[in-house]
Structures are given as C-alpha cells and as structure tokens.
C-alpha cells in the first residue's frame, strides 16, 4: 500500500532527501578523506606512504608475554594485543582485533565511536559534518560504513596542500592546555604535534555531557606523575581489574610525552627528523619520505645527519638501553601479577574496602607507571633514562603493595605464599581467567564475514557520490 503524501509532508521528505544528497555530494570542505585523490599530485609522498603496507607481519604481544593477560584481566587487551604495524593497516587492525568485539548492528558491541579517532581521515570529516557530540555519540559499529580510509594525507595536512594541521579538535585543546597552541608553533614543533594527535596518552570521558569524548589528561602537565594526579583527582578508571578489583588505568601510547623528556625532544629533534626523513628518489627529486618507520632502516638520512658514530655503534647503544628497559619491565610485571592474585586472595579471605584501599592504590599507581613506560613503543630510543626511572617506581610501588598484602593476609590466617596459576602461555593465562576464546574468535569470524562486506559496500556507494 502506498501512502499518499500531503504537500507539507512531501516538501519535508524532499528536504530530508536533499540534505542527504548534499551531504554525500562532496567530501568535507576542510577534509578530503580519500588518500587516493592525492596519488598523482603528490606521487612521491603517496607512494612512500603506501609502502607502510610492507609491515604485513603480525606479532602477537600476548603470546610473547603472557603476563600481560593477567595484568589486563577484565579489559579488552587481555583478549587480543598485537604489536603495531604501519599506517596502511590502521583500519584493518582495529576492525580485526577482538577488542572491538563482534557487533551485529550499529547499536551493538563493547566499544564506543571514539575507538576510530586515530585511525582515519574520515574522523575529522565526520566531526566537521556532525560536530563532536554527533561523532562521539554511539557505539564503534555506528562508524563502520563511514570510516573507510586508513590514516593518511588529511590527518596531518590541510586539504590539497603540504601545509600541516591538527585535524582533531581534542588535540588542539590539549596543545593549548600545555601552553603550546598549534597556530603559534614553529614548523619544527608542528612536525611533532601532528604525530601527537594520536601517539599520546588519552582517555574516553565519562561525564554525562561529554560521554565517550577523547581527551588528553594534560591539564596538569605531561609527565607520568602529572597524569596520575589528574586521573586520581577526577577518580577515573578505565576498568576494574577482574582479579584484584583494583580501579585500573590503561596507558595508551604516550610517545609524544616521553619523547619530550628525552635527548631528542630536549634538543628539538622532531618525529619527522627521525621517522620521515628527507630522501632523494631515482629521478633526483628530494621529498619527505612518508614510509614512517625505524630510523635505523635509513641511518644515513636519519641518525647519520647528526651523529658522528657509525650505525653499528648506535645500534649497540640502543640495544643496550632496550635490554635494561626490558629487564626492569619484566621485574615490574612479576611483582604486579603476584600482587593482583594476592589481592584476590585477600578479598576472598574477607578483607574490607578500607583495608584494601591503600593496597589497591599502590597497585593502580604501579601498573599505570609500568604501562606508561612500555606502551610508549619507542621509549628505549626516545627516553631510556625516563623509562628506567618510571619502571623503578613501578617496581617499588608494586613491592609495597605486596608487603601490605602479606601483612593483611597474615591477619586473616591465609597461608602464604599464594599459589599462582600456570600462565606460561597466552592460552593458559586466558584459561586461568575463564575467558571463552573459542566463542570470541567464532563471533569475530562471523562479524568479518557478514558485517565488514556491508560496511565496505556502503562506504563505496557513499564515496561514489563525492565530486
């Protein structure tokens, strides 16, 4: 049956339809999300950016270090955590990870829209079209058909030009909060600020008026202590630990913050200087290499422009620093894993919230500091001394928590030491937490088979209307 439209309802329907056509008729005035649009005009940069696809190998960080499963018990990272890959894989990896779940509709799934925020130039497009409230409202799956282009040109550049920009309003606010507004920064500083839109610590706000918004916790500064004080003051927790019941903080990837504290940051050596150097192609044309990667892979164009030592010497220095960081990282993890299980035993023995509060605070602070150091993937090069300092405080605070727990458990008549489960592999650690990995993997496979093709088809149809 066809319902007859009145003149008023017909006009309204036409207006709504026209608004959708107009919205899809072109990319945003400020943001062109399609990277391919620039492959001819900026071919050298485009081709080198596309070469980030050469990092196709997937490294399972949980398999390499099963203790991580316990440290993140009750949080998405205990399900799945792989080492980062090149920019070409940003969308692929966030779609494929178990952390984003297996939504069956736009209103389904465990994660919010904010999880797209560092993955695509479609994000600034959506914010420009919908406003931040419109963009951040809803589940991650809501953006499935909208966020279709991986990290690329418009994330860092003004539309159609090489001019740098901050494309995310939350990044602009963060820079202003620490007294370094982007529009007043030098070109050298801007080359790091554009990276700091994503390679930073951030969290998703939980207040009613800004629920799910991305914010950098920099109001009091950018050190690990500054951010710890900030989070404690607003009583923020990313999740409650499944074993110890600690209100936990999950560090993201504070590369910018740790870089600022190291030799390179202190001497104003930018991210671009080391990770996107000027190179000369076969035609003798000089350009900025957009294959963001390890400086040692292009030593002469990166390290060699400042350091007089040869590559072998510099690699030895780096490996020595990394070895020290990894050794202290392992010590912190061992203390924290034990502390979580001992806290769990204390709760089972009848410990009260008042008895546990100072213990859980030590665990919270210890793991935050450990995570801050290790989640900044390049910290062994950027700021090894700061990494060792922070990890040292993590070990101390975790050890303090264990001393407190030993005393408390003794008063409860609990036999010590507390027996720990076998967590020698990722699978055993996940089983110890009662995680049904078979179901999670099956659900994800179904999502990839049924939802992803629809997202891609819808995105293709939408972009076909762009001018």
Swiss-Prot record:
Instruction: Report the co-factor binding details.
Output: Binds 1 Ca(2+) ion per monomer.
Q: Which residues bind Ca(2+)?
A: 201-202, 250, 252
Q: Which reaction does it catalyse?
A: 6 Fe(III)-[cytochrome c] + NH4(+) + 2 H2O = 6 Fe(II)-[cytochrome c] + nitrite + 8 H(+)
Q: Does the keyword Endoplasmic reticulum belong to this entry?
A: no
Task: Give binding positions for heme c 4.
Answer: 271, 274-275, 382
According to its UniProt entry, one GO biological process term is: anaerobic electron transport chain
Sites where the protein binds heme c 2: 153, 156-157, 290
User: Would the keyword Chaperone turn up in this protein's UniProt record?
Assistant: no
Q: Which GO terms describe its molecular function?
A: calcium ion binding; heme binding; iron ion binding; nitrite reductase (cytochrome, ammonia-forming) activity
The record's Gene Ontology cellular component field reads:
outer membrane-bounded periplasmic space
User: Which UniProt keywords are given for this protein, alphabetically ordered?
Assistant: Calcium, Electron transport, Heme, Iron, Metal-binding, Oxidoreductase, Periplasm, Signal, Transport
List required co-factors: Ca(2+); heme c
EC number of this enzyme:
1.7.2.2
Q: Can you tell me which residues bind heme?
A: 115, 118-119
The EC class name is: oxidoreductase
Location (main, coarse): periplasm
Signal sequence segment: 1-27
Q: At which positions is substrate bound? A: 202, 253
Q: Where in the cell is it found?
A: Periplasm
Q: What does this protein do?
A: Catalyzes the reduction of nitrite to ammonia, consuming six electrons in the process.
Q: Which HAMAP family match?
A: Cytochrom_C552 (MF_01182)
Which PANTHER family does this one have? CYTOCHROME C-552, CYTOCHROME C-552 RESPIRATORY NITRITE REDUCTASE
Could you say which protein family the record assigns here?
Belongs to the cytochrome c-552 family.
Q: What is this protein called?
A: Cytochrome c-552
Q: Which organism is it from?
A: Shewanella amazonensis (strain ATCC BAA-1098 / SB2B)
Protein encoded by which gene: nrfA
């Amino acid at each position: 049956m066809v319902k007859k439209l009145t003149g008023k309802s017909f006009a309204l329907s036409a207006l709504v339809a026209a608004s959708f056509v107009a919205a899809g008729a072109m990319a945003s005035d400020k943001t062109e999300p399609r990277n391919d649009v620039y492959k001819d005009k900026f071919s050298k940069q485009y081709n080198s950016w596309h070469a980030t696809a050469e990092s196709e190998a997937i490294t399972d960080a949980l398999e390499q270090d099963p203790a991580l499963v316990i440290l993140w018990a009750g949080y998405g990272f205990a399900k799945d955590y792989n080492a980062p890959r090149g920019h070409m894989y940003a969308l692929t990896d966030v779609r494929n990870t178990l952390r984003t779940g297996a939504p069956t509709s736009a209103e389904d799934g465990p994660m919010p829209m904010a999880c797209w925020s560092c993955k695509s130039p479609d994000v600034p497009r959506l914010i420009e079209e919908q406003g931040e409230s419109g963009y951040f409202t809803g589940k991650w799956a809501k953006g499935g058909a909208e966020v279709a282009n991986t990290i690329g040109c418009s994330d860092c550049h003004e539309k159609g030009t090489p001019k740098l920009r901050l494309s995310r309003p939350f990044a602009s606010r963060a820079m202003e909060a620490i007294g370094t507004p982007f529009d007043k920064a030098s070109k050298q500083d801007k080359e790091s600020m554009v990276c700091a839109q994503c390679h930073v610590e951030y969290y998703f706000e939980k207040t009613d008026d800004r629920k799910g918004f991305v914010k950098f916790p920099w109001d009091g500064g950018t050190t690990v202590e500054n951010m710890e004080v900030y989070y404690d003051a607003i009583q923020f927790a990313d999740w409650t630990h499944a074993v110890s019941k600690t209100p936990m903080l999950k560090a993201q990837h504070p590369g910018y913050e740790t870089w600022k504290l190291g030799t390179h940051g202190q001497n104003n050596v930018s991210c671009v200087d080391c990770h996107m150097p000027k190179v000369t192609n076969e035609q003798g044309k000089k350009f900025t290499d957009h294959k963001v990667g390890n400086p040692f892979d292009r030593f002469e164009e990166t390290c060699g422009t400042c350091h007089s030592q040869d590559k072998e010497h510099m690699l030895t220095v780096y490996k020595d620093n990394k070895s020290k960081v990894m050794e202290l990282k392992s010590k912190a993890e061992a203390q924290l894993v034990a502390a979580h299980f001992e806290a769990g035993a204390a709760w089972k023995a009848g410990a009260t919230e008042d008895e546990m509060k100072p213990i859980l605070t030590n665990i919270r602070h210890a793991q935050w500091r450990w995570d801050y150091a290790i989640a900044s993937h390049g910290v062994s090069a950027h700021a090894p001394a700061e990494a060792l300092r922070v990890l040292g405080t993590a070990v101390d605070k975790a050890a303090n928590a264990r001393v407190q727990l030993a005393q408390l458990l003794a008063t409860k008549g609990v036999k010590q030491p507390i027996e720990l489960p076998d967590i020698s592999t990722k699978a055993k650690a996940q089983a110890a937490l009662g995680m049904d990995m078979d179901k999670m993997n099956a659900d994800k496979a179904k999502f990839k088979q049924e939802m992803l093709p629809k997202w891609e088809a819808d995105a293709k149809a939408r972009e076909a209307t762009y001018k």
